[in-house]
Amino acid sequence: MKTGILLTLCYDGSNYHGWINQTNSISTQTVLNKAIKKVIKTSEFKTIGASKTDANVHALDQKVLLIIYFTPILEKFINAINKALPEDIRILNAKFVDPNFNIREVDYKIYNYYINDHKFDIFTNRYEYFWKHSKIDILKLQEIFNLFIGEHEFKLFSGLKENEWDNYQTKRIIDDIKVLRINNKVVIQFKATGFIRYQIRIIIANCLNAYLNYKVNINTLTEMLQGIGKKTPFIIKAKGLVLQEIKFK
């Protein structure tokens, strides 16, 4: 009997090479699968993540469809898996779903990027980017990010190589971007149904450089959003990026 279980997962991505199974690196999915296998004593199961987080990216609300071939007592089953997991990965909750549930059919995903422009903090540095310049004017920065809201050509703001452009839908819609100040930290919040590889981090790096008037400006970004020009080498560190929420249709 095929059983579907929807897991809500949180993890500190610092020690992992992203979500997806890797041949030569340790990923979050690899470690989760290892814990599940230890509990059920078989390899006959499947996990599918709703979001393919990159290396060193964290998650507070990753959704994972687990397909197994028996019906467990759910609370005991999840407790056993959590016991087998390392401390930097945790299943927050779980529920039974149709095994054919489409984990990729989301209404929206929210990613937050955290920037510390106040005072260096060794205890939070693992989860934020430390800004070495003067305090960020969030209204000025918001104006730059507003360029990216809506439907645009994002191929120049992606980690895709030029020979990959035809294989991906690079014209995408970003529903909203908010620049917030919360507890002396700047939080840049992205909302969309999905993102291209490295898209958020490349957009942030370019916007911050435009804010500083360093090598790119509003005109440059506007042209790039039309697919005009070439990619810049700018990409911000992954450690400040957190998968904050996934909402299904």
UniProtKB/Swiss-Prot annotation:
State the EC number(s): 5.4.99.12
Q: Which Gene3D superfamilies match?
A: Pseudouridine synthase I, catalytic domain, C-terminal subdomain, Pseudouridine synthase I, catalytic domain, N-terminal subdomain
The main enzyme category here is: isomerase
Under catalytic activity, the entry for this protein gives: uridine(38/39/40) in tRNA = pseudouridine(38/39/40) in tRNA
Keywords (alphabetical) are: Isomerase, tRNA processing
* Role description: Formation of pseudouridine at positions 38, 39 and 40 in the anticodon stem and loop of transfer RNAs.
Q: What is this protein called?
A: tRNA pseudouridine synthase A
